[in-house]
Regions:
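Alpha-helical transmembrane segments of multi-pass membrane transport proteins
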Residues: 1-276
Length: 276
């Protein structure tokens, strides 16, 4: 979790910078609110007071994950219960609101689960046919240097992310890639120090997660794209959603490259918290 904090902030910063630059170049993409719709300072304070409970809930959920008290799934359950408690506190917890939220969640989850179901069948068939051994032998047989092998792995993961969900890729690629990566020596790029020993596993794990984040927005089977499809008006075609993801895929690639070149982005906070 600590290893992913700085890469996550980096990607968030890239996204925000892109949105600001695009809106600065083309103001129509993000027009300012009309003056009559803007909130006064007093109204902002009232709104801020109503945000205290949700902010506490966010801190609680992330705190449970950060301290290791609960798994992400368990924290999600706490967050769901807390969200209902916050809604009740604001007197908005009604049967209609809960049923609508459950229906939207069920519809979006079912869409993604069907994709995961098909991907899992493909992965199981591929592994049973010896595809994993074939890929490992192919990678080791290239004769590439360590960073060349890492680049090849990233390309393979990007390609797989276009057609499989992250769970399928986790079952398919990680058992093959991790032993290979752990056997390599990464001396660093451009005079920078590379990860050593057990740090390689942490570094590669975060790089894998950044790569998988790219798969979430990669057509044609990016789960995030289908989440958006399920929540946007029908007038917006799917092709528009796919095309809009391209700049963010590029930004993900930039973030991935920076995490590879600068291992400290991943390793600094874990070293600070737990020592070398």
């Amino acid at each position: 979790y600590l290893g992913a904090v700085l890469p996550g902030l980096l990607l968030s910063g890239l996204y925000m910078a892109y949105a600001l630059i695009r809106c600065y170049i083309t103001p129509a993409l993000g027009p300012a609110l009309p003056k009559e719709e803007r909130l006064s300072f007093k109204e902002k304070l009232i709104l801020l007071r109503s945000m205290i409970a949700p902010i506490i809930l966010i801190i609680l959920v992330l705190g449970l994950i950060f301290t290791g008290t609960a798994t992400p799934v368990e924290s999600a359950g706490v967050g769901s219960f807390g969200a209902m408690a916050v809604a009740a506190l604001h007197r908005r917890l009604t049967f209609k609101a809960v049923s609508e939220a459950c229906f939207v969640c069920l519809k979006n989850s079912a869409l993604v689960l069907w994709i995961m179901f098909g991907a899992s069948i493909f992965v199981a068939f591929y592994v049973l046919q010896g595809g994993g051994d074939f890929v490992a032998e192919m990678i080791l047989g290239t004769g590439l240097p360590p960073y060349g092998i890492l680049l090849l792995m990233m390309v393979i993961l990007i390609f797989l992310g276009m057609f499989l969900d992250w769970v399928g890729i986790l079952l398919l690629a990680v058992p093959i890639f991790v032993p290979i990566v752990m056997s390599l020596q990464f001396e660093g790029l451009f005079g920078l120090a590379g990860p050593q020993g057990a740090e390689i596993a942490l570094w590669f794990g975060v790089i894998y997660l950044v790569n998988m984040q790219m798969s979430f927005i990669s057509p044609p089977y990016g789960p995030a794209l289908f989440y958006i499809r399920g929540t946007t008006p029908k007038e917006i075609p799917t092709s528009t959603i796919f095309a809009s993801s391209v700049p963010f895929i590029f930004l993900q690639g930039v973030g991935l490259t920076m995490c590879i070149i600068f291992p400290e982005l991943t390793l600094y906070l874990p070293r600070l918290a737990f020592g070398n």
